[in-house]
Swiss-Prot record:
One of its GO terms (molecular function) is iron ion binding. With its partner (PsbE) binds heme. PSII binds additional chlorophylls, carotenoids and specific lipids. The gene is psbF. It comes from the Bacteria. One of its GO terms (cellular component) is photosystem II reaction center. The chain crosses the membrane at residues 19-35. Heterodimer of an alpha subunit and a beta subunit. PSII is composed of 1 copy each of membrane proteins PsbA, PsbB, PsbC, PsbD, PsbE, PsbF, PsbH, PsbI, PsbJ, PsbK, PsbL, PsbM, PsbT, PsbX, PsbY, PsbZ, Psb30/Ycf12, peripheral proteins PsbO, CyanoQ (PsbQ), PsbU, PsbV and a large number of cofactors. It forms dimeric complexes. Disulfide bonds: none annotated. It is a single-pass membrane protein. This is Cytochrome b559 subunit beta. One of its GO terms (biological process) is photosynthetic electron transport chain. The keyword Iron applies. Heme binds at H23. InterPro entries: PSII_cyt_b559_bsu, PSII_cyt_b559_CS, PSII_cyt_b559_N.
Length: 44
């Protein structure tokens, strides 16, 4: 992350592959945690 030329990201696209990898893992994880937490409060 130490870039001597300034704050221009030169060699890596920040939000293409990394953004997709984080969100394809994070979005279903948050959804299932919310669904499991909601199921704890459902009485039969």
């Amino acid at each position: 992350m130490a870039n001597p030329t300034g704050n221009q990201p030169v060699s890596y696209p920040i939000f293409t592959v990394r953004w997709l990898a984080v969100h394809t893992l994070a979005v279903p994880t948050v959804f299932f945690i919310g669904a499991i937490a909601a199921m704890q409060f459902i009485q039969r």
